[in-house]
């Protein structure tokens, strides 16, 4: 369903409840969060630093944590996995080597808190933030996730104490057919149609719909949003083989323009959009998802 307000869901992503008390680049002192020592991540992935000189290369960044969960009046459950998506970024947005270095040299803690009855897991990076960085973890120094989205659901009913025992940074290079907005669109203030799959995950930014695709709609102001919402039933989600928590949408070539996208292979028949989601993300399409307008670069503020 298209949103006439355009910004509501996207603003939830820019300013979700867990960050309401903390401005950009304000890192919370570790002693206010946890008594545990910070832990430095290991690294896995298909990182080739030669890619840092290629502006149209995109990578997905994920922290994979192992935590011990201690419930009140219950024994500790050890070795619980947590999936913490940091986002997808191209070299147009920030140099790859600098991003990886900042993530790997940081020290992290993990805590739990409740906001308006909803339980969150907050990951805290100790050190100095990078104000203009596209990844929230590096920009603001902390990132929160709804608890039942990132750890097994059977740990979602009570209050727990977390102890971070292992942390791995996973960097996954997106395939060459990945669509991303072109450089001038990315660093500018142009908004794109997008599909919101979760209020605490970034909207999935889509290419601009071809003009003829929304001529059928009578309201020109809502044309792009209505055009996207009218074809959601045609979109199908596929799990990317051999990638962790990475999914893709192959868009109908006759409905979407790829001219503004960063396509390495210009001969592709249709744009392919990649996004991060939990491994159990449903693959039955995007019906009933909210359509919004979103900036490709989440460091921008909606006006």
Swiss-Prot record:
UniProt short sequence motif PPXY motif, positions renumbered to this chain: 16-19
Gene3D superfamilies: Matrix protein VP40, N-terminal domain
GO MF entries: structural constituent of virion
Result, substituting residue 16 to S: In strain: Isolate Feldmann
Superkingdom of source: Viruses
Any one biological process term the GO annotation gives: viral budding via host ESCRT complex
Record's function text: Plays an essential role virus particle assembly and budding. Promotes virus assembly and budding by interacting with host proteins of the multivesicular body pathway. The interaction with host E3 ubiquitin ligase SMURF2 facilitates virus budding. The interaction with the nucleocapsid and the plasma membrane may also facilitate virus budding. Specific interactions with membrane-associated GP and VP24 during the budding process may also occur. May play a role in genome replication.
Self-association and partners: Exists as a dimer until it reorganizes at the plasma membrane into multimeric form. Interacts with host TSG101. Interacts (via PPXY motif) with SMURF2 (via WW domains); the interaction positively regulates virus budding.
Family according to the record: Belongs to the filoviridae matrix protein VP40 family.
Name the record gives this protein: Matrix protein VP40
GN (gene name): VP40
